[in-house]
């Protein structure tokens, strides 16, 4: 009887950590950022950062640029195939303004009160990795965030933005 109880508890604990991933090639292509978009080149992204070290925000996060905005993501990295086993949990953006930048945005996450963000940290805080794509073009930052969220549909992004439709430019007069 004890074995069943323990197995049941282990199963329920495992179940609480399950995450739904939604791979969909049609959605990928429908929200494709374009071959010439610099966000597609891994060399333009930061190196991998372990978000927390010993329960505190890592020095790498604290030392991120304060003169850039950009796109960022929280993800898990599996231990068995660390070169290929990635699970994107959240994608966000930090606009570049006098009061906002990529470093300030990252530092805010431990105090974030949104339910989904709290759940992400409750379940995964010791396993979260972080990468960012620095940028100062706020229009590009917003477009890239929308395209990436719509194509990947990360588990902890509560809102999936509407698609941006760009109409051809026409002369006003």
Question: What is the role of each PLM region?
Answer:
Residues 1-89, 93-173:
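Boundary/linker segments flanking structured domains
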């Amino acid at each position: 009887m004890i074995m069943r109880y323990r197995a049941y508890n282990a199963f329920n604990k495992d179940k609480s950590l399950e995450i739904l991933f939604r791979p969909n090639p049609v959605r990928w292509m429908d929200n494709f950022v374009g071959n010439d978009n610099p966000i597609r080149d891994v060399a333009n992204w930061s190196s991998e950062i372990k978000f927390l070290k010993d329960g505190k925000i890592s020095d790498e996060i604290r030392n991120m640029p304060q003169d850039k905005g950009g796109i960022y993501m929280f993800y898990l990295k599996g231990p068995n195939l660390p070169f290929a086993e990635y699970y994107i949990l959240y994608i966000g953006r930090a606009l570049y303004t006098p009061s906002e930048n990529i470093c300030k945005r990252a530092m805010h996450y431990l105090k974030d009160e949104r339910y989904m963000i709290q759940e992400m940290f409750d379940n995964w805080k010791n396993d979260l990795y972080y990468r960012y794509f620095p940028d100062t073009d706020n229009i590009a930052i917003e477009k890239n965030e929308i395209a990436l969220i719509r194509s990947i549909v990360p588990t902890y992004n509560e809102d999936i933005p509407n698609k941006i439709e760009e109409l051809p430019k026409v002369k006003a007069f």
